[in-house]
């Protein structure tokens, strides 16, 4: 039995293409892997605090007493990391906003990236500590950006996930959604076909 963690990060709730596709992924996964456990965390409905000068102090090893706000941030960081490490498959629904990921997803990464916990520095360079996992990124875009200079989502997520130890990463693209109903329907159809292929593996 596998454990699947789904991270939603769109601010558009039910209107979101990435949310709809991640819901489709969950439906298909449950149909093919009924014994698996699926956890869904909506980072827009339950937002993560923005990292600032006070909160960053909670995430660094120190003997200094923590403020109540820092204690809350550290507890949330511990919770998010424990959840991440406890799951085998990580599904990230990542819409493109202004060429990059949403603020909601970036805030999550800022609390998950902790030296000595999810990665460490060694004499040979950084080493990821979140290993043995697979990641599937479902990314929706209004325009066509794949393999072009305006796609900052794909390299960023590949780099971040690899940095913490998740190197088995597959991407599902839904592009051209803003180009009209016909193009949007094709984007959804192509993305669902890619999801079907991944689920069937």
UniProtKB/Swiss-Prot annotation:
Any one Pfam family match given in the protein's UniProt record, by short name: Flavodoxin_2
Keyword entries, A-Z: Flavoprotein, FMN, NAD, Oxidoreductase
Molecular functions per Gene Ontology: electron transfer activity; FMN binding; oxidoreductase activity, acting on NAD(P)H as acceptor; oxidoreductase activity, acting on NAD(P)H, quinone or similar compound as acceptor
UniProt remark on cofactor binding: Binds 1 FMN per subunit.
Catalytic reactions of this protein: 2 a quinone + NADH + H(+) = 2 a 1,4-benzosemiquinone + NAD(+); N,N-dimethyl-1,4-phenylenediamine + anthranilate + 2 NAD(+) = 2-(4-dimethylaminophenyl)diazenylbenzoate + 2 NADH + 2 H(+)
Cofactor or coenzyme needed: FMN
EC number(s) on file: 1.6.5.-, 1.7.1.17
Assembly information from the UniProt record: Homodimer.
Family, similarity comment: Belongs to the azoreductase type 1 family.
Described purpose of this protein according to its UniProt entry: Quinone reductase that provides resistance to thiol-specific stress caused by electrophilic quinones. Also exhibits azoreductase activity. Catalyzes the reductive cleavage of the azo bond in aromatic azo compounds to the corresponding amines.
Name of protein: FMN-dependent NADH:quinone oxidoreductase
Organism of this sequence: Escherichia coli O6:K15:H31 (strain 536 / UPEC)
């Amino acid at each position: 039995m596998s454990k699947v963690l789904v991270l939603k990060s769109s601010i558009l709730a039910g209107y979101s293409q990435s949310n709809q596709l991640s819901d489709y992924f969950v439906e298909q996964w449950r149909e093919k892997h009924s014994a698996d456990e699926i956890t869904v965390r909506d980072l827009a409905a339950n937002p993560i605090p923005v990292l600032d000068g006070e909160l960053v102090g909670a995430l660094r090893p120190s003997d200094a007493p923590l403020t109540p706000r820092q204690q809350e941030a550290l507890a949330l960081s511990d919770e998010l990391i424990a959840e991440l490490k406890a799951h085998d498959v990580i599904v990230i629904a990542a819409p493109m906003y202004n060429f990059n990921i949403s603020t909601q997803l970036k805030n999550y990464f800022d609390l998950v990236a902790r030296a000595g916990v999810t990665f460490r520095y060694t004499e040979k360079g950084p080493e990821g500590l979140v290993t043995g996992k697979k990641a599937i990124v479902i990314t929706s875009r209004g325009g066509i950006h794949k393999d072009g200079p305006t796609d900052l989502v794909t390299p960023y997520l590949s780099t971040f996930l690899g940095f913490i130890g998740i190197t088995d990463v597959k991407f599902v693209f839904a592009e051209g959604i803003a180009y009209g109903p016909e193009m949007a329907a094709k984007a959804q159809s192509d993305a669902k076909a890619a999801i079907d292929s991944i689920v069937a593996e």
